[in-house]
Amino acid sequence: QPEFRIGFLGDEAAQDVLTRNSCLKPYIEAAYGVPAKLFTFEDYAGNMQAMLGGNLDYTWYGSSGYAGMELEKPGFVVPVLTRMQPTGDMGYYSVMIARKDSGIKTLADTKGKRLGFADPNSTSGYLIPSIELPATPEVNGSLENYFSSTEFSGGHSGVVLAVLNGDIDVGFNWVS
């Protein structure tokens, strides 16, 4: 039996993601006349591979995820929607976060600190910062020479938790 399969990035608790998005099911089922199924994935790569493997019909990605799939299988995915904020702005922004009590207020304050990224396929949590940070006068070309360490923290929620727990000093996430 045909079904409409929707994938979600699962860097939050999978059940929370499914519960929060279950309201989509009746709309999809009414619009397409087939059952809708919701899936979460541990990371961007799993979601991307499910889409490229024909196991999803719809999912959300940032530009980095879309570009990665386009490079791997040109023309297979088609962008159909973009996010619009209540202000009318389109998209979202990459931001560096730190604990309020860290004393970190500027990029210069992050020298020698531990840096966390969200996911290798995240536009806001890795791609943009990995290009833009080295271009700043402070970092001057090398993340490795500026920060004491860099790591992936397991997604956007993982970055927040790692900063809160003190596992990293600063990390990249998104805001809209």
PLM region spans:
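Pocket-lining segment of extracytoplasmic ligand-binding domains
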Residues: R114-S176
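Short Pro/Gly-enriched coil loops immediately N-terminal to beta-strands
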Residues: L81-Y93
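Short loop->beta-strand "edge-of-pocket" segments that line small-molecule binding or catalytic clefts
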Residues: R5-E12, V17, D109-Y126
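Ligand-binding "clamshell"
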Residues: M69-R83
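Short, polar/charged alpha-helical segment
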Residues: E3-F4, A13-P35, I131
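Extracytoplasmic/secreted proteins, especially bacterial periplasmic and envelope-associated proteins
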Residues: T19, C23, Y27, G46, ...
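A bilobed periplasmic-binding-protein/Venus flytrap-type ligand-binding module shared by bacterial periplasmic
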Residues: L9-G10, Y93-I104
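Short helices/loops that flank or line small-molecule/ion binding pockets
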Residues: A45-T59, E72-P74, A108, G155-F172, ...
